[in-house]
Amino acid sequence: MADAEDIQPLVCD
């Protein structure tokens, strides 16, 4: 997963 941080931020609870 390349830009997973942009697609799905780590703020997913």
Swiss-Prot record:
Q: Does the keyword Cytoplasm apply?
A: yes
| Lineage, top ranks | Eukaryota, Viridiplantae, Streptophyta, Embryophyta, Tracheophyta
> How is this protein annotated for GO cellular component?
cytoplasm; cytoskeleton
Which UniProt keywords are listed? Answer: ATP-binding, Cytoplasm, Cytoskeleton, Nucleotide-binding
Physiological role:
Actins are highly conserved proteins that are involved in various types of cell motility and are ubiquitously expressed in all eukaryotic cells. Essential component of cell cytoskeleton; plays an important role in cytoplasmic streaming, cell shape determination, cell division, organelle movement and extension growth.
| Name of this protein | Actin-7
MF-aspect GO terms: ATP binding
Q: Does the keyword Nucleotide-binding apply?
A: yes
Principal location listed in the UniProt entry: cytoplasm
Q: Which family does it belong to?
A: Belongs to the actin family.
Per the UniProt record, which residue ranges are transmembrane? none
Localization recorded for this chain is:
Cytoplasm, Cytoskeleton
